[in-house]
Amino acid sequence: MELSNNQVIQLRNGKCGVVASFNDKPFQLVFDSFTTPIGRYNAELKNKNANYDIVKVFDGSKVENVLDVFKKKFNTDDLTLVWESNQ
């Protein structure tokens, strides 16, 4: 799975974040309290620490305010699921 602009991601630990881009190329994952380079994830969107594995990717084009993604009560039910881990 290759990440792209306007996507919301959900980690195994439940945190949601957004894909940040530079010159239309995704390069960082941004969360409420940290950022991480996309290069830390393999092709299956797994991290060295399983708690930070990406388990779901959503189309974030419907998100009106990107800061809402960082709220604990952010609801992904209204977003279109693009990819889900099989584990």
Predicted region positions:
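Intrinsically disordered, low-complexity, charged/polar segments
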Residues: 34-87
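Short aromatic-centered micro-motifs
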Residues: 9-10, 20, 57
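SH3/SH3-like beta-barrel fold
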Residues: 28-32
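Short coil-to-beta transition motif at edge beta-strands of beta-rich domains
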Residues: 1-13
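Short small/polar-residue motifs
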Residues: 13-18, 78
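Exposed beta-strand and adjacent loop surfaces of beta-rich binding modules
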Residues: 6, 26, 54
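Short beta-strand-centered aromatic/proline hotspots
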Residues: 16-27
